[in-house]
Amino acid sequence: MNTILAQQIANEGGVEAWMIAQQHKSLLRFLTCGSVDDGKSTLIGRLLHDTLQIYEDQLSSLHNDSKRHGTQGEKLDLALLVDGLQAEREQGITIDVAYRYFSTEKRKFIIADTPGHEQYTRNMATGASTCDLAILLIDARKGVLDQTRRHSFISTLLGIKHLVVAINKMDLVDYCEETFARIREDYLTFAEQLPGDLDIRFVPLSALEGDNVAAQSANMRWYSGPTLLEVLETVDIQRAVDRQPMRFPVQYVNRPNLDFRGYAGTLASGSVKVGERIKVLPSGVESSVARIVTFDGDKEEACAGEAITLVLNDDIDISRGDLLLAANETLAPARHAAIDVVWMAEQPLAPGQSYDVKLAGKKTRARIEAIRYQIDINNLTQRDVESLPLNGIGLVEMTFDEPLALDIYQQNPVTGGLIFIDRLSNVTVGAGMVRELDERGATPPVEYSAFELELNALVRRHFPHWDARDLLGDKHGAA
């Protein structure tokens, strides 16, 4: 057991009291991002080291690994605490998204260490999708780079409102205040074009030496602001999902016996109470909540983020992918939408292509109708393109095979975010965030003959490359 943990347990009066105190601490999810070799993994290693979150056996192993794979000479290579893949250690880079957990007396943290190489931008977007704050590292010798801009834009696109710009490697520029001021001004000029009302803070630091990470630096007395750890401990995170209407995507129909039928999932936003009237989409059927079942027993009320099972007072047809919301809420299913897309495949995204899309627990097919524009990462301007390349970001018009219950992503990331899946390889090729909804898709149902339905099913099964639309999608969506 490490020293700080033992001291905390002693201060709380025992393990049980300490565990209860941990449950009541606020949780901050954040990621580190930026360009290649800006020191993202080293920064996380320094945070873990300086908050005494490393056990003795880990420290001993780190000494040995630093001799074999380290890039810091005789010093500890703290990046090895995070870079766990063999390829990462051999190349000295981050490839996968690495998650680490630690806590201080004030807060609990989940860190996502994301890769800086452009070819791994897809992994960075994955890590950012669940975070509340982004630490953007900038090498003090290089200043603001393309990847800095790209990661900043992706972070804000994914709804992150708090950005901490950590200007790293200040030790390599002799802790120069003018260098810090110049990079700060350059980034603020760029950030004027970023969407949304952002909270941007700047911290000069050296992850390798520990300056301004967990303790104030004696080498930068000209900086009077908080350390990075102080920023993380005190930043006020207001989660929009707590204030949004209730949304409950059904992930699983739980029926362990004939006497129980519940609908399991994670409450995406808002809250739900026993006795509350709810509506099921796309069917529109209403019922009321009889029980809210959790691992710890029944509850009278559940809030956003809780994993629950809802039991209703009526036996109605609900399946995976359906959406439950308050009965007095109006959410018209849409077949057409404008989607912000981060493309992750070698093959470009082009109009006319069809993909499987997955939204919460719902999976359907969608067709790319048009690409309105691609974002130029250097200046955030819009330019006309015929296709969206690997790591490209743009606004795309899409049509779904069936009407979907969607929210705007900035209002609700769970019911407004989706992924693109290649229908032949089943590989995730893109991420999408709903920007605009077009409800013109609420068309009257069409009746098809049995022969038409059989032929349609046959074509879709044996000739998927024809991109035939599922005729039942329309019928079920309008039912």
UniProtKB/Swiss-Prot annotation:
PROSITE patterns: G_TR_1, G_TR_2. Residues 113-116 are annotated as: G3. GO terms for molecular function: ATP binding; GTP binding; GTPase activity; sulfate adenylyltransferase (ATP) activity. InterPro entries: CysN_GTP-bd, CysN_II, CysN_NoDQ_III, G_TR_CS, GTP-eEF1A_C, P-loop_NTPase, Small_GTP-bd, SO4_adenylTrfase_lsu. Residues 34-41 are annotated as: G1. GTP binds at residues 34-41, 113-117, 168-171. Pathway: Sulfur metabolism; hydrogen sulfide biosynthesis; sulfite from sulfate: step 1/3. Its EC number is 2.7.7.4. Residues 168-171 are annotated as: G4. It catalyses: sulfate + ATP + H(+) = adenosine 5'-phosphosulfate + diphosphate. Residues 206-208 are annotated as: G5. Residues 25-239 form the tr-type G domain. Gene3D superfamilies: P-loop containing nucleotide triphosphate hydrolases, Translation factors. Pfam families: GTP-eEF1A_C (PF22594), GTP_EFTU (PF00009). Residues 92-96 are annotated as: G2. Keywords: ATP-binding, GTP-binding, Nucleotide-binding, Nucleotidyltransferase, Transferase. GO terms for biological process: hydrogen sulfide biosynthetic process; sulfate assimilation. With CysD forms the ATP sulfurylase (ATPS) that catalyzes the adenylation of sulfate producing adenosine 5'-phosphosulfate (APS) and diphosphate, the first enzymatic step in sulfur assimilation pathway. APS synthesis involves the formation of a high-energy phosphoric-sulfuric acid anhydride bond driven by GTP hydrolysis by CysN coupled to ATP hydrolysis by CysD. Belongs to the TRAFAC class translation factor GTPase superfamily. Classic translation factor GTPase family. CysN/NodQ subfamily. Heterodimer composed of CysD, the smaller subunit, and CysN. This is Sulfate adenylyltransferase subunit 1. It comes from Salmonella enteritidis PT4 (strain P125109).
